[in-house]
């Protein structure tokens, strides 16, 4: 069946968005703990509103970290430094409510079901079962060099650029909160051919005019990020379409950890299992298995075994082996999906302990993922973005 030309849209947000503030606080706390106690169990949730930060969750660790100090340093780094913003690093209240991990959950994670029943030794599985049941997806496609869908790739780059021109004073009137959205047109073969629409909403100083913002963002943000060949005379631009965006950040909207899961992943282009990432250590398969699924999918595409690949993993709490592994190549595979699943089983250890070891996840690496996407990053070295398994997959597939 012939495909029709169609549009697809993805969005991103800046690090000053209320939900992203929360993600960064949660991951900053996680990193601080992991830097002193690599085996800590952390599930850290944050909420922000006008003048207030609440940090809650379950943390089991042998170390101590100064949570209010970490919170204030994170907010300072984002750029909320003035009380007139309705939220700033010095004057905001910080409340904490931290418990230890449930003993019932810890029992399942500490010693997986297979080990307790004698099916494997503790040494083989490193005594780690999945921290919860659930399903996770990973995706890759050959639309961009980083093997990500083009709409989310461009949306992230625009959001990052908004922050850059604010922090380096190119556009000193910008404030931390902002959102971007990109609509891409695909041809009959499913290939991206042009950018149809760009939406940017950015918080700003009250005295700047809309005309100035419109001109500056087109010149210093859009032109700097979006390849000129993707923009034509029909491309539509909506810059601060309400006309004014002065009240923003936690003063404008309350924020919560884990509320930007589509921004964090593939911009809606691939399926999502529902679990959020930030504030969770690697024994939580919501995070570690989603990273592993991306690693698998990216290596499949990098090996030339498919033009696009979506990998689903699923787990039961306290059980180390995934209960299911599936691969969907959307008709682009060079080998059957059954063969791909077998290749995945033979080349990737997808037990939680295996993932942690394979991707070296007991490190303080998470704050850098908490804004501008966890996947397709070229500005930081993330283990799940490497394509070091591609050659072996290609050889074993006989290609």
Curated annotation (Swiss-Prot):
Its EC number is 2.5.1.6. It comes from the Bacteria. Belongs to the AdoMet synthase family. The gene is metK. K(+) binds at residue 45. It comes from Bacillus cereus (strain ATCC 10987 / NRS 248). One of its GO terms (molecular function) is ATP binding. ATP binds at residues 17, 177-179, 244-245, 253, 259-260, 276, 280. Pathway: Amino-acid biosynthesis; S-adenosyl-L-methionine biosynthesis; S-adenosyl-L-methionine from L-methionine: step 1/1. Keywords: ATP-binding, Cytoplasm, Magnesium, Metal-binding, Nucleotide-binding, One-carbon metabolism, Potassium, Transferase. Coiled coil: none annotated. It catalyses: L-methionine + ATP + H2O = S-adenosyl-L-methionine + phosphate + diphosphate. Homotetramer; dimer of dimers. Mg(2+) binds at residue 19. Binds 2 divalent ions per subunit. PANTHER family: S-ADENOSYLMETHIONINE SYNTHETASE. Catalyzes the formation of S-adenosylmethionine (AdoMet) from methionine and ATP. The overall synthetic reaction is composed of two sequential steps, AdoMet formation and the subsequent tripolyphosphate hydrolysis which occurs prior to release of AdoMet from the enzyme. PROSITE patterns: ADOMET_SYNTHASE_1 (PS00376), ADOMET_SYNTHASE_2 (PS00377). It is found in: Cytoplasm. One of its GO terms (biological process) is S-adenosylmethionine biosynthetic process. Its cofactor is Mg(2+); K(+). This is S-adenosylmethionine synthase. Residues 101-111 are annotated as: Flexible loop. One of its GO terms (cellular component) is cytoplasm. SUPFAM superfamilies: S-adenosylmethionine synthetase.
């Amino acid at each position: 069946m012939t495909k029709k030309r169609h549009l697809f849209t993805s969005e991103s947000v800046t690090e000053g968005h209320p939900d992203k503030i929360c993600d960064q606080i949660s991951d900053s706390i996680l990193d601080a703990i992991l830097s002193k106690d690599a085996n800590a169990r952390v599930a850290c949730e944050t909420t922000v509103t006008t003048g207030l930060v609440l940090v809650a969750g379950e943390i089991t660790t042998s170390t101590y970290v100064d949570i209010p100090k970490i919170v204030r340093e994170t907010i300072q780094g984002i750029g909320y430094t003035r009380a007139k913003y309705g939220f700033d690093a010095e004057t905001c209240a910080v409340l904490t409510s931290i418990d230890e991990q449930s003993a019932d959950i810890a029992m399942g994670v500490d010693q997986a079901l297979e080990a307790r029943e004698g099916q494997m030794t503790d040494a083989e599985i490193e005594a780690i079962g999945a921290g919860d049941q659930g399903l996770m997806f990973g995706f890759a496609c050959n639309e961009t060099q980083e093997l990500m869908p083009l709409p989310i790739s461009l949306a992230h780059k625009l959001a990052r650029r908004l922050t850059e021109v604010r922090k380096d004073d190119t556009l000193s009137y910008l404030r931390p909160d902002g959102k971007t959205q990109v609509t891409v047109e695909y041809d009959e073969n499913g290939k991206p051919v042009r950018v149809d629409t760009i939406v940017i909403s950015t918080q700003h100083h009250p005295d700047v005019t809309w005309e100035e913002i419109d001109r500056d963002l087109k010149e210093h943000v859009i032109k700097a990020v979006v390849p000129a060949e993707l923009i034509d005379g029909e491309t539509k631009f909506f810059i601060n379409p309400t006309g004014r965006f002065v009240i923003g950040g936690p003063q404008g909207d309350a924020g919560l950890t884990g509320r930007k899961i589509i921004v964090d992943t593939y911009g809606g282009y691939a399926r999502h299992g529902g679990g959020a990432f930030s504030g969770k250590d690697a024994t939580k398969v919501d995070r570690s298995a989603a990273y592993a699924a991306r690693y698998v999918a990216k290596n499949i595409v990098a090996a030339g075994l498919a033009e696009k690949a979506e990998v689903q993993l699923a787990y039961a709490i306290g059980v180390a082996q995934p209960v299911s592994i599936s691969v969907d190549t959307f008709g682009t595979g060079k080998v059957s999906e059954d063969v791909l699943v077998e290749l995945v089983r033979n080349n990737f250890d997808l037990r939680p302990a295996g993932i942690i070891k394979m991707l070296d996840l007991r490190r303080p690496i998470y704050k850098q993922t908490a804004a501008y996407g966890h996947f397709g990053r070229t500005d930081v070295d993330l283990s799940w973005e490497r394509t070091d398994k591609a050659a072996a997959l290609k050889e074993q597939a006989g290609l």
